[in-house]
């Protein structure tokens, strides 16, 4: 993504009060924080199957989208917004949780597979390509073995952050918001050099 190219920022998550603050919804949490920082509110947009707001990122206006389709159908909302606004896929950035990354770590990528994430799988299916930018936000994995991970995945991603974890999440989301400005001003590669090396204070497990 070239500097100034970002036009659509999508946070992945599940709708409803039941899922507020859960690990799977950290993409929503990032957009909520950005909207609060910019003093804007999300409004329902049925044609996009989601909630939408608009903010300035760098010197450009960027639309924020939180699909309300549930995670497995996120791609429907993304496709609808891309088509309605006449955007190219390289103007899109998706914010998504990642169990393969420790809590506190970030990975900015220009493309890639779904990596087992149903929201990304839906986006790839509806966009017809995996060549779109995504910022993976680490939420850590449950357990120490593959068996424990499989058994506890659902409860982990649908669980809320502990009080101590929430302190790290605050730092991470601040870095994400700073990173969005870097992406818009400097482009994906230079922004990624910083974001991918980020480590929050007090995070020995990162």
Swiss-Prot record:
Q: Where is this site: Stabilizes the basic form of H active site to accept a proton?
A: 97
User: What cellular component terms from Gene Ontology apply here?
Assistant: cytoplasm
Presence of keyword Protease: no
Which Pfam families does this entry report, sorted A to Z? Pept_tRNA_hydro
Primary localization class, coarse: cytoplasm
Fetch the SUPFAM superfamilies from UniProt. Peptidyl-tRNA hydrolase-like (SSF53178)
The catalytic activity, as recorded, is: an N-acyl-L-alpha-aminoacyl-tRNA + H2O = an N-acyl-L-amino acid + a tRNA + H(+)
Cite the PANTHER family for this sequence.
Answer: PEPTIDYL-TRNA HYDROLASE
Q: Which family does it belong to?
A: Belongs to the PTH family.
Protein name, per record: Peptidyl-tRNA hydrolase
The upper taxonomy is: Bacteria, Bacillati, Cyanobacteriota, Cyanophyceae, Synechococcales
């Amino acid at each position: 993504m070239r500097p100034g190219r970002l036009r659509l920022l999508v946070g992945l998550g599940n709708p409803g009060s039941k899922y507020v603050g859960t690990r799977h919804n950290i993409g929503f949490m990032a957009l909520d924080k950005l909207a609060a920082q910019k003093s804007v509110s999300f409004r329902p947009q049925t044609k996009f199957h989601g909630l939408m707001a608009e903010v300035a990122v760098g010197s450009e206006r960027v639309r924020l989208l939180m699909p309300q389709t549930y995670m497995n159908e996120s791609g429907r909302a993304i496709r609808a917004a891309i088509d309605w606004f006449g955007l190219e896929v390289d103007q899109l950035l998706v914010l998504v949780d990642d169990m393969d990354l420790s809590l506190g770590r970030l990975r900015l990528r220009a493309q890639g597979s779904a990596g087992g994430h149903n929201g990304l799988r839906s986006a790839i299916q509806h966009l017809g390509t995996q060549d779109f930018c995504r910022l993976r936000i680490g939420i850590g994995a449950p357990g120490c073995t593959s068996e424990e991970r499989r058994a506890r995945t659902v409860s982990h991603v649908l669980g809320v952050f502990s009080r101590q974890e929430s302190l790290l999440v605050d730092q991470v989301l601040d870095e994400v918001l700073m990173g969005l400005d870097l992406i818009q001003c400097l482009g994906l590669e230079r922004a990624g050099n910083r974001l991918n090396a980020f480590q929050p204070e007090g995070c020995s497990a990162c």
